[in-house]
Amino acid sequence: MILNETVKNINTFVGHIGMLLTHTVGILKFYILVFGRKKIQNIMDMLKDDEYYYDAVDNFCPAQFLNNGKKLSTKLSVLLFMMYSFSGILSHTSSLMVINTEIKGDNFLETNKTCQDFMPFFFKIPFNTDEKWECELAFWFMDISFGIFAWLIACHDGLYVTLLIFLRCQLVILGQVFRSIRRRSLLALNLPKNFSVIYDRDHPEIEAEMYKQLTHYTAHLKVLLKARDKIEDMFSFVTLCQTLACLFIYSSALYNISMTPIGSTEFFVQLEYFICILLELSAICWFGNEITIASELIRLSLYESDWLSTSTRFKKSLILTMTRMQRPIYLTIGKFSRLTLATLVAVFRGSLSYFALFQSIQ
């Protein structure tokens, strides 16, 4: 419907293409929330499995680190809800201010405008809007509909970011646990911190505990790798659609901002919408990048795990794990590109090119 009504005028089309793509991707996100609930719950259970709870050693407390990750995900989720909601509130307020300024009477008879001219976004009004109060009612009708849809999108984005944060936290925790494996083994055997041996094989209890701990940590790593695969399967396609859409959404938003007088209410409406869309992709790219960094540090943690005096079987198992971690963990955008900050920069650069194109044909 938007295409049929706006494609006749290139300026109008460019101005509305961002909203069109936003809601198209939003439908895919709604589909994931509705039909992927069991898979999402399975991923959450894998990332918070109590079997892989670790005690604090030295200056690192895994439980506190994980709680900090929970607090961060909560703050980001609340921020997304507030930003997405405020976009509709600000556009509603702007429309009311404009219509009350330009329309002094109770209807549009003495003007050459209709209610559609004052709508912040293209919207098919399902009832008569000849009167001013009817147009204001249409504002409420549109904003409530957009608000509900914005909350659904915020639910998806908040959930996705939370899963990325938890995966990153677990990888960081696992890296610290690998590094302190000897210290944890000594604690498990109630041995003093400064207890040392030349060869672990001379102390079978230490050798057995070290190998037991390494096997347990490696099993945790396998669980995280499986969780990564499930997250990839669940969100990879919608992330691809989101990334491709952002190429045009960013350029459309920048075009709208450039066409609006600076300081006007409409200017701040478009600016807030642009910030929302930028935050949406930036969050997942940022934590996708953090996951890759955390996984790369695991290999270094394995090397720093005080393995010189360990047994042959311990060293072989350690080498196998290090070999696996030579290939870092990363999420992809539809299997085409890694979910990193470099991708975000590439998308923004591409959108600037489209923005320049839109400017040249206005």
Language model region names:
Residues 1-362:
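Membrane-embedded alpha-helical segments and the immediately adjacent membrane-proximal loops
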